[in-house]
Amino acid sequence: MSSHPTKITFFEFLTPLITSGQKTITIRDESESHYVPNTEVEVFTLETDRKVCDIKILSVEPLNFDEINEFHAEQEAIELPKLKQLIREIYPNIDKLFVIEYELIKK
């Protein structure tokens, strides 16, 4: 049985968007692209490692930086220019990204 990630971290300011169900994707680089569809993952804050909620991974798809569009911004619950700026700050000079789609597990 292959192991798969069971934890994912988000900036604290994004966690209310996740727990409200507004944010349904995350864009990551290849090092964080190994999530497996139909698995449950615990969400923690990056800054304080506080558990926030659980999500179910729906899909993991390759995405180039220049393909990020209004649809992704809507799913991220952030305006497109802000989203692109944030991605560039986190992953400078990386164009090969992955979009991870998920849903909130309501307990």
UniProtKB/Swiss-Prot annotation:
Gene Ontology CC: cytosol
EC category: hydrolase
Catalytic reactions of this protein: N(4)-acetylcytidine + H2O = cytidine + acetate + H(+); N(4)-acetyl-2'-deoxycytidine + H2O = 2'-deoxycytidine + acetate + H(+); N(4)-acetylcytosine + H2O = cytosine + acetate + H(+)
Stored InterPro entries: AC4CH (IPR008314), ASCH_domain (IPR007374), PUA-like_sf (IPR015947)
Keyword Nucleus among record annotations: no
Transmembrane stretches, start-end: none
Keyword Transcription regulation: no
Catalytic activity, EC: 3.5.1.135
Keywords linked to the UniProt accession: Hydrolase
NCBIfam families in alphabetical order: PRK04980.1
Similarity-based family: Belongs to the N(4)-acetylcytidine amidohydrolase family.
Protein name (Swiss-Prot/TrEMBL): N(4)-acetylcytidine amidohydrolase
Organism annotation: Vibrio parahaemolyticus serotype O3:K6 (strain RIMD 2210633)
Species lineage: Bacteria, Pseudomonadati, Pseudomonadota, Gammaproteobacteria, Vibrionales
